[in-house]
Amino acid sequence: MELIKSRLLSEGSVWHIGSLSAVYLSQGLSGGTLFALTTYLVSIGASVKDISLLLSITMIPWTLKIFLGPIIDSFTLNRFGRRRFWILISQVAMMLAVMPLVFIEVSEVNFLLICLLTAHNAFVAVSDISVDALAADSLNADQMANANGFMWGSKTLGRGIGMALATSIFFSYGVNEGFLILIILMSTAFIFPLFSEELSYKAGQQNESYKNRLTLGELIAGVSASMFNRSAFAAMIFMLFANIGYGIFDVIYNEFYIEELGWSGEEIGYLRPFGMWLGGLIGLSAGLLTIYFQKRLLLLLFITGQGLVFLAASTFDPSTPTWMTSMAIIGVDAVDAGWSVLIFSILMALCTTNTSATNFGIFMGFGNISMLIGNNIAPYILGAGDYSFAFVFAALSLIPCWLTGYYLTRS
């Protein structure tokens, strides 16, 4: 009985936070491997349009989280746990989707590669919204900032580990071996949700046990109670603009650094993980920092920091010192992790009903649409000007986030 209790996902225990973080770590490993893959493909001849196409299409499942939420809220098998059921299914499917990449040659952006990575991302999206809903359901309000720090920190650390390992393996051995290592690492992280136990009720609502299904009326009522207010509207505006600049950066930075600044793909692939690891540490500490500093100050500081990284990149040319161009690659992920942890704790606090997957999925759907917009407009922004113009545009796209972030962190 004591062993089962120790694996119960409640009260912010070590196992509770560790299990949530393990799922996030798995998602980070996947994302880091994709970052390394785009760098590798650019280094062997892929264009900005190729990378834009790859990232845009593989991002589509993330934008559909708005529609995945109601499904995850409405259907489950409580014997496996309301959210854990979906986490287990999606984690297994994530690994199966990339299994073919262990065997087929990957030397360009093509239809098969796009299809496999899109399927993989679809299951990652299901896992993501399920674990977010699990966190919103199982954590008390005063635990969310700290837990989000560990969760997002783990995801960012996972990205760094995934990108560093994949870069080394892609350039030294090949893409097939890189995806084999990814599957092995995701299988290891899968142990935590596999052996966990989930509460049968939302934290703080012990008298209302979960049901296997929610009716349409219950779903609509739950969404309405959480989403029809000014704070939720401001949060949606924030998320709609949050990732446009990051999406532009991800599409163009490889070509910019390789063709304009004279870097190699391996140099990029080895350096960027340091920013992700720094972001992981910032993410882990961001929740704790809110104890000593106002959340508003920290959120606006990180948003401003990301804008400054983009503006700095707009000034780079071949004569720019290497330490300065290196700081931009490191900084973009470091500051992104900081504001992400803070805004996600705010979003989870807005999910006050049993429709957490739908509520959080709406917020994250807007965030992923934002990334999709950035990925898609990057070639056109670059075509309308130059790299400097594209980076300035990325910085300016953060202005609505600064304004809505100020509103969301009011006392």
For each predicted feature, which ranges?
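Short amphipathic helix-loop junctions that connect adjacent transmembrane helices
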Residues: 35-50, 251-268
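A late C-terminal transmembrane helix in Major Facilitator Superfamily
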Residues: 354-382
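Intracellular juxtamembrane helix-capping segments at the cytosolic ends
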Residues: 125-139, 338-352
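C-terminal ends and interior cores of transmembrane alpha-helices
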Residues: 87-107, 304-319
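Helix-to-loop junctions at the C-terminal end of transmembrane segments
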Residues: 64-81, 282-295, 382-383
